[in-house]
Each structure stands twice: as structure tokens, then as C-alpha cells.
Design a protein with these regions (language model features):
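A cross-family acyltransferase "interaction/gating" segment
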Residues: 172, 177-194, 202-322
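Hydrophobic residues at beta-strand termini and immediately following loops
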Residues: 197
Length: 322
């Protein structure tokens, strides 16, 4: 009798779990479809151009990168050099690609991210965007060209401002560092179309993988945003450029199979006052430092926005020129 009761209870528990999973799966699938439809409707109603390759599955993009002939040779060479099995090196490459490749979602970018950015930026700043100059430049760009928007780097808020300013015409993809590889930021940034990079990681094979990914999305027409300074300016003057990603893009022109134009659009972001002003002044006087670009520094920037909202007026002028 006890055995029968135990079996009956177990059957009810299993049945309950199965029912819950079926209902949950159906609900999640329906919600995902509704969110995708809402994002697509938003983009269509505003005639926003989205790069098709952004919607390719992550597994497909990863496989395209892995299909690079020189990458396969480099994996074999790295295994021989390190005395490790080829499978171990391939596993490392797969892990890096998992970090790098995004999973763009229109609802996440336009209905969630854009709405939050608009609320925060317009509440904190007076945002001035030279849309005429931007539209004038974009009209001159060939429809099949690969476009790279090149920004100066004045503040930790630049990433938000750049995406917000261009969102009415294009959703750009750009690299983000290790600071964003924490939950839930990693999932959010992937859905915003950002790809993750390991700054300061010296492994040559990793940089080959990253370069092949960047070159792949350029070949497929994905519009990118690049901050060549690689870090905030300390005094308002442009820093010496770090040409990593720009070099990956420019080197494609040496490939005879690549026939597209690559258009670099310089975009200026200027402030009356940056969020990090107090820290920058202290650093200039030798009494402090902004330190490395970390999640903590980004959170500090967010706190600065909240703390200064009642009194700070910032004019951001974004201008583009061919």
C-alpha cells in the first residue's frame, strides 16, 4: 500500500513538472513571438534600416568564422606549438566565439534599450543631434557599402549617446570590454548587438579569431561603431589611437575577393561638462585616478547621472562628415 501511494505521488509530481514545463515553454515562445513582432513593427513604422546579418543565428555566424582557411591552419599550428591536442585548442576557440558573437534582438534594442536611453539622456542632458549632417552623409553612402562610424571618447556615457543618436536610422554594433561580462549586462549587450572583446589579452590565436569575426560582419554589411582611442580622454584632446579593430577592417581592402566600399564616418561627441569631471580634475592634480574600465566605473557613471540630474545641463553635439 505504501509503495502504491509512493508511486502515485511520484506520478503526480512528474506529471506536474511536465505540465509546468509545457505551459512555461508555450508561454515563453508566445511572449518571444510577441516581442519580436513588436520590435519589427516599431522598426518598420519608422523606416529604420537594419542589417540582415544581425539576425543570423549565433551558431551560423560561429561556423562562418570557423570556416576561415587560415584559422584552421592557425589552430593546428597553435596545438603543435603548445603541445596540446587540437581538440583542446578548438574548444578554446569555440569558447572565445561564444563570448564574441552577439544575439541581436529588435525589441531589446528599440523597445527596451532605446526607451531607457531616451529617458535617461533627455532627463539628464540637453541632447543636440545634427541630424541634417547625419542624413546628408548617409545619403551619399552606397547601399552595399560597409559603414564604420568612428567616435571620439569623452565619457563613459558615449556608448549610450552614440547608439541613441544613430538609432533613428541604424542600429550599430560595437565592441565592449570585460566590464559588461556580468549578469544581466552580458545578455542585454548581446541583444543590443554588441560583441565582447578581451582587452589586453595577448594570445595571437584569439586576435586572429576576433579579426576574422570583425571582417566577417564587415563583409556581410553590418554597420559598426568604433572608439579608436580605446579609453577616455583625460584632458579633452584626442588620445593616440589604438587601431586594432580599424586595422582589421582596413586590411580587408588587400583581399581581392572583397569588392565593397568601406566608408568611415567620423562622428564628434562633445559636452559642456562630462560626468567624470570631478575624477578627471583630481587625476590631473595627482590626487586620484579613473583607473581601469570596469563595471564599477560604469556604475559610478550611472550614479553620477542620477546625482547630478537636478542641476546639470550638458549639450552633446553629434556631427557627422564624409
Amino acid at each position: 500500500m505504501d509503495v502504491q501511494r509512493l508511486l502515485s505521488t511520484a506520478a503526480w509530481v512528474v506529471g506536474g513538472i511536465v505540465t509546468y514545463e509545457l505551459v512555461r515553454s508555450a508561454f515563453v515562445s508566445r511572449l518571444a513571438r510577441r516581442m519580436d513582432r513588436a520590435g519589427s513593427d516599431y522598426v518598420s513604422s519608422r523606416n529604420i534600416r537594419l542589417d540582415r546579418y544581425k539576425f543570423a543565428s549565433r551558431s551560423y555566424v560561429k561556423q562562418e568564422v570557423l570556416n576561415s582557411p587560415d584559422l584552421a591552419k592557425a589552430i593546428d599550428a597553435s596545438a603543435a606549438e603548445q603541445g596540446k591536442p587540437v581538440e583542446k585548442i578548438r574548444a578554446d576557440v569555440d569558447s572565445w566565439l561564444d563570448e564574441i558573437v552577439p544575439a541581436f534582438n529588435t525589441w531589446a534594442f528599440y523597445r527596451f534599450g532605446f526607451s531607457i536611453a531616451r529617458l535617461a539622456l533627455n532627463f539628464a542632458f540637453e541632447v543636440i543631434i545634427d541630424r541634417r549632417a547625419l542624413e546628408r552623409v548617409q545619403k551619399k553612402i552606397p547601399s552595399d557599402a560597409a559603414v564604420v562610424y568612428v567616435f571620439n571618447h569623452r565619457s563613459n556615457a558615449d556608448f549610450i549617446i552614440a547608439s541613441y543618436a544613430l538609432a533613428s536610422s541604424i542600429a550599430i554594433s560595437y565592441a565592449v570590454g570585460e566590464w559588461a561580462r556580468v549578469w544581466p549586462l552580458d545578455s542585454l549587450f548581446r541583444r543590443f548587438g554588441a560583441y565582447f572583446v578581451r582587452r589586453g589579452f595577448r594570445n595571437p590565436l584569439y586576435h586572429l579569431v576576433l579579426s576574422r569575426y570583425v571582417q566577417l560582419i564587415v563583409r556581410r554589411g553590418v554597420s559598426q561603431g568604433v572608439f579608436p582611442e580605446g579609453g577616455l580622454t583625460r584632458d579633452g584632446a584626442l588620445r593616440e589611437p589604438k587601431l586594432g579593430i580599424l586595422e582589421y577592417v582596413a586590411s580587408l581592402k588587400a583581399d581581392p575577393t572583397f569588392q565593397k566600399d568601406v566608408v568611415f564616418v567620423p562622428v564628434g561627441i562633445n559636452y559642456d561638462r562630462v560626468l567624470e569631471d570631478t575624477s578627471l580634475i583630481a587625476e590631473a592634480k595627482g590626487g586620484g585616478s579613473l583607473g581601469k574600465d570596469t563595471l564599477a566605473s560604469r556604475l559610478a557613471t550611472g550614479w553620477a547621472i542620477l546625482r547630478k540630474m537636478p542641476s546639470m545641463l550638458v549639450v552633446n553635439s553629434l556631427r557627422a562628415a564624409a
